[in-house]
Amino acid sequence: MVASAYSFMASTWASEEWKKTVIRQRLVEWRNQNTVTRIEKPTRLDRARALGYKAKQGIIVARVKVEKGGMDKQRPNSGRRPKRMGVYGFSPAKSLQFIAEEKAARKFPGLEVLGSYYVAEDGKYKYYEVILVDPHNPVIMSDPQFNWLKNPANRGRVFRGLTSAGRRTRGLLKSRGLKGTIHYKIARKKKEREQKKRHEASKYYRLAKYDRIPGK
């Protein structure tokens, strides 16, 4: 079976030599750009076409950079231990890809997010490219592949977690095993409760080590 052009694109993008030469040079330019930058064509054409991208009117691509790391929480003025200030160690309950889609949707309020994909990352940012569609463009409204976006039920779909990244964050996408499903969250919470019981600071753990509970 002859390999397609898109398979060659995917293998080239995954090669370490490509990342060390081409991607590293592009990251220097991308870091100095705005948070949301509209681009003429997708950087990873194979991923864009897999998500439904077409080079036609009403469809644009935007590159979004999202800062890596935890949340930038405000430091409280009232006194407390540094451990209890709630500043460090907090991460958002959404993936960075989901956040990138929301940033692009706010930049282009008249468009709907079709999908997004990972591009690259450096020490400070992760870069994603988001595909946006104008649901009221005549070309889009006459295309059966995209005219479902004009339905009012799909308005603001990215802010309701209806994109692929949003559904993955909500635990609704299927995967091998429990991970990636709503049942994985239940199993994870159950495991966390058991670990909390066995912690040395837990009253349950301290009393469990006695043959007889004190005071009884």
Swiss-Prot record:
Signal peptide: none annotated. One of its GO terms (cellular component) is cytosolic large ribosomal subunit. SUPFAM superfamilies: Ribosomal proteins S24e, L23 and L15e. InterPro entries: Rbsml_eL15_core_dom_sf, Ribosomal_eL15, Ribosomal_eL15_arc, Ribosomal_uL23/eL15/eS24_sf. It comes from Metallosphaera sedula (strain ATCC 51363 / DSM 5348 / JCM 9185 / NBRC 15509 / TH2). One of its GO terms (molecular function) is structural constituent of ribosome. This is Large ribosomal subunit protein eL15. The keyword Ribosomal protein applies. The lineage of its organism: Archaea, Thermoproteota, Thermoprotei, Sulfolobales, Sulfolobaceae. GO terms for biological process: cytoplasmic translation. Belongs to the eukaryotic ribosomal protein eL15 family. Keywords: Ribonucleoprotein, Ribosomal protein.
